[in-house]
């Protein structure tokens, strides 16, 4: 029998001591006493219950065979048990008690990974993002790990590596905090929910582990070594805190079906103009996209990363049944999905090389003033500074979960967002268009140190408004 490698044995002897240089990607481990116990009613218990039942058969006396378990079967059962414990620890962090539907989707993703249906890397984009599937191989979500973001160390796309090596002076976006894209994705959904826009697919922060994710060679070697030690020397292998690859934290966004890139539909609409009612619906959805992007100051909004769903067949059937060119305004036949929100929430306005403009500002829809429907929906929210403060506090609760969270940097992010909200409020009151909104001077609204500590906030006494005059080298306006 081959001997285990010396480095694996050395790691096993020190497994009881906590590591001082754990990768920030790794899941915060639970105490062994806590995660060694079977969970009750937690996501993933159904699948792991079946695995436990399969292992229990080995311990029960059979009618045709003696109740003696072979060494190989004992090792296999031990390995399966340790892997289940690791999976339980991962699933413990993916509990969404306030949203059972989302928890069920994440559970399906975990179950699929356990049976070998792994997430599939998306070829498009500049980061490592993955289509997550259920056990039937149906796409149910998009997972974007923190470590594989455009400027992350484990980004599998070579384009950003070439960018970093060949043009380091222009590498990255100087106005954004590095490796915070997964929080930006979840934060965009939070803003969308608070403002009742309804254009961002549900997005939350989750932990997932899969062989198809991009791991370092060291992590993969450790995983193989621990499995080898557990298989050959079970007593030693059981001392490891985790068996298998380390979980990755990232944003999980529900997959939207029957949507196409906006670029496709915009060309179609130029050649085949929409009916008046459908045009109004599209304009309303477009204005919501503008409001979202402007508030979070999205630095990466092109016509290829927002989606449109237009149910032409349903509209045709409606026309045939009513023999009219008029349909119910309340029935939305065209919708917009705002995806790819990972490069938002800057801590300052872009003022270095590029301006990162909103590409929707050059569309014909951007020249139309904001509708009364949009003004009535948004103004009651953003004109109330108590609502704005609540929004900042909700974002704080989300962003502070990151290990590299910095309170001062977060306050700078909120100062930019408050300035954007202030401009948007003025534009809606003045009846401006999205294009005119994008041309307004950049404003920063900083929280005054002498402001009150209560929940009721007054703009004049608690905040200081500053106009940001510095423009980037390549300016859009």
From Swiss-Prot:
Keywords: ATP-binding, Cell membrane, Cytoplasm, Endoplasmic reticulum, Endosome, Golgi apparatus, Kinase, Lipid metabolism, Membrane, Nucleotide-binding, Phosphoprotein, Transferase
Major localization listed first in the record, in broad terms: cytoplasm
List of residues binding ATP: 129, 144, 253-256, 267-268, 340
GO biological process per UniProt: endosome organization; Golgi organization; phosphatidylinositol phosphate biosynthetic process
E.C. designation(s): 2.7.1.67
Region of interest (Important for substrate binding), residue spans: 149-151
Reaction it catalyzes: a 1,2-diacyl-sn-glycero-3-phospho-(1D-myo-inositol) + ATP = a 1,2-diacyl-sn-glycero-3-phospho-(1D-myo-inositol 4-phosphate) + ADP + H(+)
PI3K/PI4K catalytic domain: residues covered: 116-447
GO molecular function: 1-phosphatidylinositol 4-kinase activity; ATP binding
Annotated segments matching region Activation loop: 338-358
Sequence segments annotated as region (Disordered): 1-80
Localization terms from the record: Cytoplasm, Cytosol; Golgi apparatus membrane; Endoplasmic reticulum membrane; Cell membrane
Stated role: Together with PI4K2A and the type III PI4Ks (PIK4CA and PIK4CB) it contributes to the overall PI4-kinase activity of the cell. This contribution may be especially significant in plasma membrane, endosomal and Golgi compartments. The phosphorylation of phosphatidylinositol (PI) to PI4P is the first committed step in the generation of phosphatidylinositol 4,5-bisphosphate (PIP2), a precursor of the second messenger inositol 1,4,5-trisphosphate (InsP3). Contributes to the production of InsP3 in stimulated cells and is likely to be involved in the regulation of vesicular trafficking.
Family (UniProt): Belongs to the PI3/PI4-kinase family. Type II PI4K subfamily.
Name of the molecule in the record: Phosphatidylinositol 4-kinase type 2-beta
Organism: Rattus norvegicus
Lineage, broadest ranks: Eukaryota, Metazoa, Chordata, Craniata, Vertebrata
């Amino acid at each position: 029998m081959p001997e285990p490698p010396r480095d694996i044995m050395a790691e096993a002897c020190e497994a009881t001591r906590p590591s001082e240089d754990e990768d920030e990607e790794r899941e915060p481990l639970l105490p062994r006493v806590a995660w060694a116990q079977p969970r009750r009613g937690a996501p993933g218990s159904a699948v792991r219950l079946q695995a436990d039942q399969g292992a229990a058969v080995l311990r029960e006396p059979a009618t045709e065979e003696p109740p003696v378990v072979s060494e190989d079967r004992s090792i296999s059962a031990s390995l399966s048990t340790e892997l289940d414990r690791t999976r339980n620890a991962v699933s413990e962090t993916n509990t969404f008690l306030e949203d059972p539907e989302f928890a069920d989707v994440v559970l399906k993703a975990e179950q699929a990974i356990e049976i070998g249906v792994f997430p599939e890397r998306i070829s498009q984009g500049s980061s490592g993002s993955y289509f997550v599937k259920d056990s039937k191989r149906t796409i149910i979500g998009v997972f974007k790990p923190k470590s594989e973001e455009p400027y992350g160390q484990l980004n599998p796309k070579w384009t950003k590596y070439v960018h970093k090596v060949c043009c380091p002076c222009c590498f990255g976006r100087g106005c954004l905090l590095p490796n915070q894209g997964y929080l930006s994705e979840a934060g965009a959904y939070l803003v969308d929910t608070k403002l009742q826009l309804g254009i961002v697919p549900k997005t939350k922060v989750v932990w997932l582990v899969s062989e198809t994710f991009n791991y370092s060679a060291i992590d993969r070697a450790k995983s193989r070594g621990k499995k080898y030690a557990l298989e050959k020397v079970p007593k030693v292998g059981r001392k490891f805190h985790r068996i298998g690859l380390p979980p990755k934290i990232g944003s999980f966004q529900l997959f939207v079906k029957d949507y196409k890139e906006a670029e496709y539909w915009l060309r179609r609409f130029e050649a085949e103009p929409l009916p008046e009612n459908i045009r109004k619906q599209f304009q309303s959805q477009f204005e919501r996209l503008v409001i979202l992007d402007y508030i979070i100051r999205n630095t990466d909004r092109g016509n290829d990363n927002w989606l449109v769903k237009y149910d032409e067949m349903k509209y045709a059937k409606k026309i045939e049944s009513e023999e009219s060119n008029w349909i119910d305004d309340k029935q939305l036949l065209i919708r917009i999905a705002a995806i790819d929100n990972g490069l938002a929430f800057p801590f300052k306005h872009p003022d270095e090389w590029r301006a990162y403009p909103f590409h929707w500002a050059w569309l014909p829809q951007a020249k139309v003033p904001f509708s009364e429907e949009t003004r009535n929906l948004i103004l009651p929210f953003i004109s109330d500074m108590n609502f704005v403060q609540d929004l900042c506090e909700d974002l704080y609760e989300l962003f502070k979960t990151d290990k590299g969270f910095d309170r001062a940097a977060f306050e700078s992010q909120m100062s930019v967002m408050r300035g954007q909200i202030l401009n948007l409020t003025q534009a809606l009151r003045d009846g401006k268009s999205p294009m005119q909104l994008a041309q307004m001077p950049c404003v920063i609204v900083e929280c005054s140190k002498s402001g009150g500590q209560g929940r009721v906030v007054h703009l004049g006494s608690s905040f200081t408004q500053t106009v940001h005059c510095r423009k980037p080298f390549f300016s859009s306006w």
